[in-house]
Amino acid sequence: MKQTWRWYGPNDPVTLSDVRQAGATGVVTALHHIPNGEIWSVDEIEKRKATVEEAGLEWSVVESVPIHEDIKTHTGQYDLWIKNYQQTLRNLAQCGIYTVCYNFMPVLDWTRTDLEYVLPDGSKALRFDQIEFAAFELHILKRPGAEADYTAEEIAQAGQRFATMSEEDKARLTRNIIAGLPGAEEGYTLDQFRQHLATYKDIDKAKLREHFAYFLKAIIPVADEVGVRMAVHPDDPPRPILGLPRIVSTIEDMQWMVETVNSMANGFTMCTGSYGVRADNDLVDMIKQFGPRIYFTHLRSTLREENPKTFHEAAHLHGDVDMYEVVKAIVEEEHRRKAEGSDDLIPMRPDHGHQMLDDLKKKTNPGYSAIGRLKGLAEVRGVELAIKRAFFSK
């Protein structure tokens, strides 16, 4: 695997020097300062690329070129935003950047309820608490019809949890959910959030798939033409939330994508932490079935709790993800590619490290502090080395 590191640009508290010292050779970044829908110019791309290369690194993957909400709802100027997206892909290819991670999640990108969940060892992790999320949806957001998405027991527990919350607890929970997490391109006030949710009131899974298919049929031929590989990121969490449909959550969704636009430019980001939240997702089977189309990997693990819809970010080699088998399947796919004459390594980044040690004293991007990811990268690197020595050394 090609070892990479997500970097949020010049304002990231983790510097490119830190990234290089961690042992990564590639950088995963995006032009977050450009508004959603606007074209990334060659000049802006080259500026960022030069910054990365001056640090002795390579811009390996774009994460993400965000998709304008008009495209997802098929309203407004969606065709203009698609044309702009096509041009951005052409410009990236012109600059020698050929792997693009993106997602098609409505309204929100990844969602958590607690950004500072304290683990027994004192480090901090990200957590999604199903009951706290229900308390937000039922008692703060007050989304019509939300009760249908929860069991009677969850509704009762959410009411009890809400009753014990201080005003600061409610404000923090609201911020965590709607204000935008690192890498998310949108943040909302509560009223704006309600308005955005309302734009999806007539959009179910089938309709959102129609809109995604329209996007893919417009984008993938351009990507194919210029040599860009599109790598869709799964939904996080991988199930419907807030009454919104989710369409990149299962192996069946992956198969639908391939059948909809059967081009090798139409590929996947294997995010083990997102797909792995669902017990019915067999990560190794996903890699084996769609290995030739996996162009990027996010390696992390989550741990489901007593309520299986509640989970927190586990250490990279613990939790519900069998990281050994996952890495072995990825190495096997790379070995297959090499046997066919390609030295095409799959970029991997350690995802969502714990906030720990000296980083506990610093202001960090949730999930993206340096030391926790350094630890995760070192652990995964060791697993990969052991697998290669045991199974693939001559």
UniProtKB/Swiss-Prot annotation:
Keywords of the record: Iron, Lyase, Manganese
Reactions listed under catalytic activity: D-mannonate = 2-dehydro-3-deoxy-D-gluconate + H2O
This protein's record includes keyword Iron: yes
Known cofactor(s): Fe(2+); Mn(2+)
InterPro entries: Man_deHydtase (IPR004628), Xyl_isomerase-like_sf (IPR036237)
Species, as recorded: Salmonella arizonae (strain ATCC BAA-731 / CDC346-86 / RSK2980)
Keyword Manganese applies: yes
Superkingdom to which the source organism belongs: Bacteria
Family (UniProt): Belongs to the mannonate dehydratase family.
NCBIfam families in the record: PRK03906.1, uxuA
Top-level EC class: lyase
Biological role stated in the UniProt entry: Catalyzes the dehydration of D-mannonate.
Gene Ontology BP term (one): D-glucuronate catabolic process
Protein name, entry field: Mannonate dehydratase
Gene it is expressed from: uxuA
Pathway(s) per entry: Carbohydrate metabolism; pentose and glucuronate interconversion
